[in-house]
Amino acid sequence: MSDIKEFISNGFVIKRKLFSNEEIDKLNQYIAIRQDKEKSARETTTSTGKLTMTMWNHPSEDLFGKFSTNERIVKPMEIFLNDEVYHYHSKIIWKNPGDGGFDWHQDYGYWYHNACLYPDMASCFIMLDKANKENGCLKVLKGSHRVGRISHARSDTPEQTADNERISELEKRHESVYIEAEPGDALFFHANLLHASDANKSQNSRRTLIVCFNTKSNN
């Protein structure tokens, strides 16, 4: 199956070794030196513990910006979404040993409230560390983007997640796929694809750089 057919059918595409070990090592070294002091970090409490993320809206001229606007990400995005795209925002998920996961949700469940009329949006999830079930890798409901936007609400924690009743039914019909991957691998996924992650039960970090895009016609 071609990448575009896979994206349309499943809602996601995995590109192995989109970035080399050297490129990821360089980015990780840059993160360690910068400690991301100039970005806005925030900690949230989820159903399985705390989770820290760093988010920014405008790609700068630094190494973060170079990754966020790299043609290896942008060109596939424009093919998958069939339109010119622009950088919506980027973030780093800092998932240290013992940190929590995140319940099932859709990105468009949030972005819908930012005056984005259509779900013609997607994200690229770049692995900075090895990702596996033990350290809380991402998991997706294959093909769930086709159900459309699901209502999101707060449960017992500050996070907003997808309606539990609908999730229960969808889990019966859609395969849950764990995205186990190596540093430099990347996951492209539709804004309506349901995704989640479990807590990090390992002794290793699971950091990811996520670059999100909107289509020009949806601005």
Where are the regions a protein language model picked out?
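Non-heme Fe(II)-dependent double-stranded beta-helix
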Residues: 2-10, 15-115, 153
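Short, structured patches in soluble enzyme cores that scaffold and shape functional sites
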Residues: 106, 126-130, 142
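Non-heme Fe(II)/2-oxoglutarate
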Residues: 34-46, 183-188, 192-219
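Generic beta-strand structural signal
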Residues: 83-90, 100-102, 120-126, 136, ...
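Short, conserved beta-strand element in jelly-roll/cupin
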Residues: 114-133, 180, 212-215
